[in-house]
Regions:
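Conserved Lys-Pro-Asp/Glu-containing loop-to-beta segment of HAD-superfamily phosphomonoesterases
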Residues: 28-33, 154-177, 182
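Low-complexity, glycine/serine/proline-rich disordered segments
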Residues: 1-32
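Cofactor-binding loop segments of dinucleotide-utilizing enzymes, especially the Rossmann-like FAD-
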Residues: 118, 174, 200
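Residue-level detector of alpha-helical secondary structure
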Residues: 7-10, 14, 18, 102-105, ...
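Extracellular glycosylation-rich, acidic/polar low-complexity regions of adhesion-
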Residues: 44, 196-201
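Short, surface-exposed basic-aromatic patches at helix termini and helix-loop junctions that form
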Residues: 129-137, 158-164, 183-192
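A structural signal for isolated positions on well-ordered beta-strands in alpha/beta enzyme cores
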Residues: 112-114, 170, 194-196
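Alpha-helical substrate-recognition element adjacent to the catalytic core
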Residues: 18, 28-152
Length: 201
């Protein structure tokens, strides 16, 4: 019964996506891997978000390690955010999932491995350069900057990839709200998926 329910949900989601203009490509076992960047592929970076209190003008600098927990707190308080510093990649060492990314490239090929970040799209050049410095080469178009830190934004992006025919999807992110949002969406699809929270040892 559970399998039938999932299939019905899957068809309903597909029908809804088709109405919204997505086109589906039928392919057998098409795998992909999606990695967050900060605190996942890279740690100890020197970038920061500037959070401004619209009432008082008070500014707080939030680094990428603090962002997953501090960001939602400040957003709830009405703070406004400036991500300009995240166009660059400053500092940083190998993150906990960098080797996993290399493994997934060997398994699925570089064209099926993606970086999905809340940084702006303008950061793609710097991210690409940093990855290349680590011996990682994926197509430049596979680096997506959403300029949006909401988990739903990443979930919607994953749905787009599902509509392109991917049916074996791996996603990893350090921010629990992102992990939950993506897992909630992928669990409704009749596909193989694995959603992981990146943790620094």
């Amino acid at each position: 019964k559970q399998a039938e329910l999932i299939k019905k949900q899957n068809k309903a989601i597909q029908a809804d996506l088709e109405k919204r203009g997505y086109e589906f490509v039928d392919m057998d076992n098409r795998g992909m891997s999606t990695f967050d960047f900060d605190e996942t592929l890279i740690i100890d970076g020197k970038n920061f978000v500037v959070a401004t209190n619209p009432k008082t003008g008070e500014q707080i600098k939030v680094n990428s390690a603090q962002w997953p927990t501090k960001g939602p707190e400040l957003a709830a308080q009405g703070y406004e955010f400036n991500f300009d510093d995240f166009v660059n990649v400053r500092g940083g060492v190998d993150g906990p999932l960098l080797q996993k990314m290399k493994n997934q490239i060997k398994k699925y090929g570089p064209e099926n491995v993606f970086v999905l970040t809340a940084r702006p799209q303008e950061a793609a050049t710097a991210i690409d350069g940093w990855l290349k410095s680590k011996g990682i080469n994926i197509p430049f178009k596979n680096i997506t900057g959403l300029a949006d830190s909401r988990g739903q934004a990443k979930a919607d992006w994953m749905l787009e990839k599902f509509s392109e025919g991917y049916n074996d999807m791996y996603f990893v992110d350090d921010a629990l709200p992102n992990v939950k949002a993506v897992k909630n969406v992928l669990d409704q699809l009749d596909i193989k998926s694995k959603v992981v929270q990146a943790k620094i040892k």
